[in-house]
Design a protein with these regions (language model features):
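Accessory helical-bundle/CTD segments and flexible terminal tails appended to RecA-like ATPase motors
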Residues: 1-92
């Protein structure tokens, strides 16, 4: 399991980036038989001034998480939207 968490002060921008990132990651997941769930607002959708979205990817145990090189991921995310990648998250 891998949880990608996005946050930003602009709701529409953060939502749009989450949607675009999920679309981009879908092909990586499908090739490796992983499932992509989301994006969806986090359970607590706003903390302070930041809106939070998440994407969950889940796949066969013992297989490598199908993410592109991180330098490519960072190019997809504008500076005012933050991405956190949580492998084997303790909480969803």
């Amino acid at each position: 399991i891998c949880l990608l968490k996005l946050s930003g002060e602009n709701y529409e921008l953060t939502e749009s980036i989450a949607i675009n990132l999920a679309k981009y990651l879908l092909s990586f997941c499908e090739k490796k038989n992983w499932k992509l769930i989301g994006p969806a607002p986090s359970l607590i959708a706003k903390v302070g001034k930041k809106f939070r979205w998440q994407i969950l990817i889940h796949g066969p145990e013992g297989t490598k998480i199908p993410l592109p090189d991180r330098s490519i991921l960072w190019k997809l995310i504008p500076k005012n939207v933050f991405l956190t990648i949580d492998v084997n998250p303790a909480e969803l």
